[in-house]
């Protein structure tokens, strides 16, 4: 329904049939597939045994909307006037990156390593989506890839074998022709080919916009989740090829369904869950993915899990929730 959109041009989960019918939390296509395979086995058409519940791959993805809290002169002035004062602001501004409350990347990688040690290194990947463009107010903060701090973050990614994807700007979401330019800029700064993408604000607006991802050389897109409801937007927990609705062509572009974005769970305008409810709902989705032998894509922003100060963060338990989910995956 092209006429039903929020202020960012997104079709929301609460408007979808799966949500209204009460099965957004189920990978319904995977369930149908399992049922059909069972019938085929009963009819002796297919002899393959159904696999036991098992998550094929875990993608720990992190959108780097705001990599640092207080690393520019503007930030320093802001925190001196409105924050905790000059002394504390100066420590964040002038000290090592580890003193910045938004620099939570080492902790995130530590969680990945814990999970990899149990389930295997090939079944778990860390993926940081980094912006390289955008001038909209919704693209703030506008950070520079060539800055000393960003270069240090990119070096950290290289050292820790973290994959880097393009976090397409809000502007590029509205004008998809900009995607190629942003991708090329990120590639120049990283020195590597970039083939993964996620749209800022999860703002994948129209189906035909996927053509621009193809043209830019994107092979895998991780945008396919609703911002307002965690669950299965595509009805499946498995990666699927995009099908161009205009010519019915099966595209080489692969869409990875996003199961859980942390702010979908807690934001008052979205699901508005408390910690216990968020953990229970997330655990339910994880079990559904395992039952379907799918892949689990999680999205936690680096600035949502800060422990020292909570600027613009609605709740203080997202770090605790992420750690609990990692433990749940280790157990299962």
Could you describe each region identified by the protein language model?
Residues 22, 165, 229-233, 294:
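Glycine-centered flexibility motif
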Residues 159-160, 216, 292, 332:
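Structured helix-beta-strand junction loops
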Residues 89-94, 158-162, 197, 227-230, ...:
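Short C-terminal domain-edge/linker segments immediately following a structured domain
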Residues 1-145, 238, 245-332:
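Terminal accessory/targeting
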Residues 171-250, 256, 298, 307-310:
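Catalytic domains of cell-wall/extracellular-matrix polysaccharide-remodeling enzymes
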Residues 63, 167, 213:
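Conserved hydrophobic/aromatic pocket- or pore-lining residues that grip, position, or stack substrates
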Residues 66-70, 106, 110-204, 302:
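Metal-dependent polysaccharide deacetylase catalytic core of the NodB/CE4 family, i.e.
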């Amino acid at each position: 329904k092209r006429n039903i959109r929020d202020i960012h041009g997104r079709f929301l989960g609460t408007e979808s049939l799966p949500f209204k019918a009460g099965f957004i939390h189920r990978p319904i296509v995977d369930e149908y597939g399992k049922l059909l395979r069972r019938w085929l086995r009963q009819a002796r058409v297919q002899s393959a045994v159904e696999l036991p519940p098992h998550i094929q791959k875990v993608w720990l993805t992190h959108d780097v909307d705001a990599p640092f809290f207080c690393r520019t002169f503007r930030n320093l002035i802001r925190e001196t006037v409105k924050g905790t004062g000059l002394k504390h602001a100066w420590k964040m501004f002038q000290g090592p990156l580890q003193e910045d409350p938004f620099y939570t990347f080492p902790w995130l990688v530590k969680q990945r390593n814990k999970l990899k040690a149990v389930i295997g290194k090939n079944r778990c990947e860390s993926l940081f989506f980094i912006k390289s463009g955008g001038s909209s107010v919704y693209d703030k903060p506008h950070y520079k890839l060539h800055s000393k701090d960003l270069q240090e973050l990119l070096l950290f990614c290289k050292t820790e074998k973290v994959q880097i994807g393009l976090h397409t700007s809000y502007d590029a979401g509205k004008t998809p022709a900009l995607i190629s330019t942003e991708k090329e800029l990120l590639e120049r700064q990283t020195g590597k080919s970039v083939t993964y993408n996620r749209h800022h604000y999860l703002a994948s607006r129209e189906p035909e916009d996927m053509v621009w991802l193809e043209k830019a050389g994107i092979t895998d897109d991780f945008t396919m989740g609703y911002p307002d409801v965690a669950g299965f937007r595509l009805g499946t927990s498995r990666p699927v090829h995009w099908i161009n609705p205009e010519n019915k062509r099966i595209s080489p572009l692969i869409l990875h369904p996003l199961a859980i974005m942390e702010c979908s769970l807690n934001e008052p305008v979205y699901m508005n869950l408390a910690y216990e409810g968020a953990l229970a709902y997330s655990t339910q989705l994880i079990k559904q993915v395992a039952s379907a032998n799918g892949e689990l894509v999680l999205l936690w922003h680096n600035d949502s899990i800060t422990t020292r100060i909570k600027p613009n963060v609605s709740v203080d338990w997202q770090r605790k929730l992420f750690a609990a989910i990692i433990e749940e995956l280790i157990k299962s």
